[in-house]
Amino acid sequence: YHDYSYEICGRNGAIVFYKSNLLNKDTANWVILQYDTNLTQTRNTEIHIPNLAEPISSYYTDNFVHILFQKDDNRNKSSVWFLLTYQCDSVNTKLLPLALTLNEISYIKAYDDYLYCVANEKKTIGANVVHLPTMEVKGIYLEDYYIEQYAFLEIDTLNERLLIGALHFPKVHEALSTFALIDSDLGFNEYALKQYPESDGIWLTGARCAVSDSGDVLLVGTYNHNTEKRLSNLHTGVYALPYRNGKMGEI
């Protein structure tokens, strides 16, 4: 029995990857199968990966598939990370350790020379950016009194910036949920934290981000309108919120 994972690779078809067998107590053999767009197998690659490391997330861009592996370090109550980079149009495949500062990575995305890793840990939204040529790691952390939930990560390629969204859910129903937006350059060198102004009687419950060709941003999501601050009187709706030149619009 094998636990298969896959990644769609655009014009390069798709890859399927799985742990094939255990070489010794420290090392496992993994297989990567590449298929073209007609689902004909074109390559079979084997690579040795530390035993007990498991794939957490993968992302395809510009002929490369990046696969993030996590191995728990129970002694230090932390995680050890590895990045496998598979090149679809070449035999080049490599595995490198990553010095990430977060333990609960749930999503990765790659653009240009950067790999973005987003975590949703206890009460904290965090993200690491890896500069792939040097493997240097930087971090952004969004901490708040409220319990937070990661909403999106979008890249504005026109203006070379990164947008990370997080919902702030209240601990008690009397408090209104808000939304936080991290607006950063690609390398996390400079960033600003923006928040929705709290709207009377509205709880934000979802958010997605769309970036236009002109660089304008539209935030779209759902909300609950609470007329009497009772769960039985919640009415769901949809909002659209423009974000231009570092300023939020109004719901």
Show where each model-derived region lies.
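A short beta-strand motif characteristic of beta-propeller blades
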Residues: 1, 41-47, 91-98, 136-144, ...
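Asp-box/WD-like beta-propeller blade repeats and closely related beta-sheet repeat scaffolds
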Residues: 79-81, 89-116, 120-126, 135-153
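Short beta-strand elements that form the blades of beta-propeller/WD-repeat-like
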Residues: 5-25, 57-58, 62-75, 106-121, ...
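Beta-propeller domains
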Residues: 15-47
